Structures are given as C-alpha cells and as structure tokens.
Design a protein with these regions (language model features):
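Structural recognition of the beta-strand scaffold that forms the well-ordered cores
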Residues: 27-31, 52-57, 115-120, 139, ...
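Catalytic-loop motifs flanking and including active-site residues across diverse enzymes
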Residues: 133, 137, 242-245
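Extracytoplasmic substrate-binding proteins
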Residues: 41-126, 160, 223, 227-273
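Extracellular/periplasmic catalytic domains that process cell-envelope and extracellular macromolecules
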Residues: 2, 21-22, 46-48, 108-113, ...
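Short, solvent-exposed loop/turn elements at domain surfaces
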Residues: 1, 30, 125-130, 238-240
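Active-site/pore-lining binding-face segments in mid-to-C-terminal subdomains
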Residues: 172-247, 251-252
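His/Asp/Glu-enriched short active-site or ligand-binding loop at hydrolase and phosphoryl-transfer sites
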Residues: 134-158
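Acidic/His-rich segments in extracytoplasmic proteins that coordinate ligands and/or metal ions
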Residues: 1-81, 159-209
C-alpha cells in the first residue's frame, strides 16, 4: 500500500488508542511486552476494549537452538492466530533444518582451527562496538562455527560492548563483519543503501573503504587478508531470526567445509516461499 494511505497511530511505546480503535482492528501485535515509560501489553489491552493485544516475542531468537526460542514459538502462535498453522509449521521446520545442517558440519571443526571473529558496526553507526553472544549476530557467529573474540561480563544483559583500540589490536581477528542498518525505528535512513531496493553498490563500497582506511586497523589480519565484510541489518533484525546471517557467515568462514551450502539459493527460497 501507498504510505500516504496508512494511518499513523503514534509510537509503539505510547500509541494513540483512539486512532487504533477507529481502525476497528481485531488484533494488535506489539513489538515488546513494554516496561518503564513504554506501555505494557496489559496496559494497551486495557485501553483497547475488544482488541486482542498480542506479544509474539519475535525479537527474541536463539539462533543456535531455535526450538527453544520465543521467536519460533511466536511464529507458531501467529500461525494459530491467522489460521495459517500449516504454513507456520513449514516455516519453523525449514529454519530448524537449516540450523541442524549448519551445526552438523560446524561441530566437526577442531577448536584450534576455528576462525576468530569481530562482529562490529559500520562507521556510520557511531562508537565502535563488539556484538557479544547474547546478540543475534553473536549467536549466528556461534552457529556458523566462528569464535567471537569479545564477550560481555558475566551476568551482563548487554548485547554489545565498546572495546578500546588496544584490545581490538591484541585480539587481531581473522574475520570482521560490519553490521549496517538502513532503516531506523524513527523512519529515517542510514548509509549505505542496501537491500531489495538497492541496485548500486557505491555507498556500500564507500562505507567499507572508510573502515579499511582506519590507520589503527591497517595491520589486522582480517584487513590484510581482505576478510572484512558488510552484513546487512536485516540479518540481525528481520523475521529470519538471524538464521540467514549464520548461513552467509558459515560459507564465508569455512568455504571448504560448507561446499554444498548456497546462501543465495537459501536466501531466494526465503523470499519466494
């Protein structure tokens, strides 16, 4: 639909309940259960009589063990809600099969042959980060057989940390993945242009070159060996729950192990089906 025909009902944390009710919905899917200044699911339900307010938990994947994730349970619940149980089950099984296929091969790689990885953000996204195992990217890295060089302190709930340059240099990663975000929560855009609506790789190349031009990183193994990759924000934030990101990572990190893994084919199957 044309964006001009879609009603703006306010922010996800404090929506305009009157506008929502005027649309006569039967169901409202919420992004998070809410806390603090963000209205909870129960509060939204109290303000929307006659509307089923549902939190599916799709932003909580467990890429290494999706069967135990709120993400996969959310897919199955959505199947019941929208009377698409067979389709939801097929999708859930598809994700489980991909995970099993990758894990079966990654688990055979000896510890001393694991590729070391730094999962960071592109230069356009502010201060330098390292995404840890709690984050979707960190989980995708583990499934793909990568050894994430950065971890959060014990009992931390952080998805990333901010390592200093000295620490990064001392870790000297074999591979670096730069997380990029095109569309923001506020509806804005970041460079580089990417995704289905992008046919020109110029901005992607400029962002990559900006990172590679960082003097402090010039002698890192990943930079020297041209093992620095942009990874689209969709592989962290979209409805694949990080699994597709793991597919690409596995093929990049271990092309000789995952010889029959075709990321483009799997990606196309996801889009088509």
């Amino acid at each position: 639909r044309n964006a001009d025909t879609i009603t703006n009902v306010g922010s996800m944390s404090s929506p305009d309940y009157e506008k929502i009710l005027n649309l006569n919905p039967t169901t409202l899917l919420v992004f998070s259960p809410g806390s603090g200044s963000s209205a909870t699911t129960a509060q939204k339900a109290a303000n929307l009589p006659g509307v089923d307010v549902v939190y599916l938990g799709l932003y909580n994947p467990n890429v290494t063990n999706p069967a135990d994730s709120r993400f996969l349970q959310g897919i199955l619940k959505a199947g019941y809600i929208f009377n698409k149980v067979d389709r939801a089950t097929e999708y859930a099984n598809w994700i489980l099969n991909i995970t099993s296929e990758i894990n079966a091969k990654a688990s055979t790689i000896p510890e001393n042959q694991l590729k070391t990885v730094w999962l960071t953000n592109s230069p356009t996204l502010g201060s330098t980060r390292a995404y840890v195992e709690l984050d979707t990217l960190g989980q995708a890295c583990v499934l793909a057989g990568g050894k994430n060089l950065f971890q959060a302190p014990l009992d931390s709930t952080a998805f990333s940390i901010n390592p200093d340059t000295e620490t990064i240099l001392s870790q000297d990663p074999d591979y670096i993945f730069l997380h990029t975000v095109r569309y923001t929560y506020g509806g804005g855009t970041n460079e580089p242009a990417q995704g289905i609506d992008c046919n020109d790789p110029t901005e992607m190349d400029l962002v990559l070159q900006e990172f590679l031009a960082t003097p402090a990183y010039a002698n890192l193994a990943a930079v020297q060996n041209k093992h620095v990759y942009l990874i689209a924000g969709d592989f962290r934030n979209n409805a694949m729950g990080g699994t597709l990101g793991a597919v690409y990572m596995a093929r990049i990190l271990y092309p000789d192990v995952f010889t029959d893994l075709n990321p483009q084919s799997i990606h196309q199957e996801y889009i088509t089906k």
